[in-house]
Amino acid sequence: LWYLVGGFSFFYFMRYKGLTIFSSFFGAFSFTLFPHYQALWAEGHFTKFRAIMMLPLVIFAAHYFFNNRNILGAVLFALSFGNQIRTQHYQIVFYTALLIFSIGVYPFLKDIIEKKWRKIIHSISLLLVSIICSLCLSAQPLFLASEYLPFSSRGTNTVDLSKKNEDQNVSSGLDLQYATQWSTHPSSIFDWLIPRF
């Protein structure tokens, strides 16, 4: 199912951007059968796989919203982004949010330069409502994640069952060095295209 979501979303996004049917199909086919996804399945990173498969739909919805600034675009964006957040892979969701921001900067700056204040207020209102709807759509997994966060290695304290209670380390979660290291080192990019490179 997730392969279909990613493939069809990529295909329609490419068609929306003006590519031919053949080019769109080849792009969607290449995106869907990327070798890295097999590694995600094998290593148990299914949440990351689902979040990546939602990426073309979210980007398509963001482009559509920023080009048209209407309710249909806001609804499409809210549904797609909310469903991506529901996949619970917050690293990919964060990268998607950065990508959405980079897509939306130019139209808003253009409107500011042209002093289209009414259009800016309308667009920001629709965008805020759609982000709130996205968060409401994904509230259940977000609340669960916030509930178990203090007991996660990314939260405040973890328990080591091999140590006595008085020997436990009290920490404030991940240190900055660990949290900001590469999840995929740049030299591993060749492995995405050619496995075991």
Give the ranges of each region predicted by the language model.
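Periplasmic/ER-lumenal interhelical loops and adjacent helix-loop junctions
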Residues: 140-197
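Short hydrophobic helices that act as membrane-entry/anchoring signals
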Residues: 107, 111, 122, 187-195
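Short intrinsically disordered, low-complexity coil segments enriched in acidic
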Residues: 1-6, 14, 175, 193-197
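Membrane-embedded helix bundles of polyisoprenyl
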Residues: 3-17, 21-111, 123-145, 151
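Membrane-helix interface linkers and caps
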Residues: 112-116
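Aromatic-residue-lined binding/catalytic grooves and analogous aromatic/hydrophobic interfacial grooves
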Residues: 119
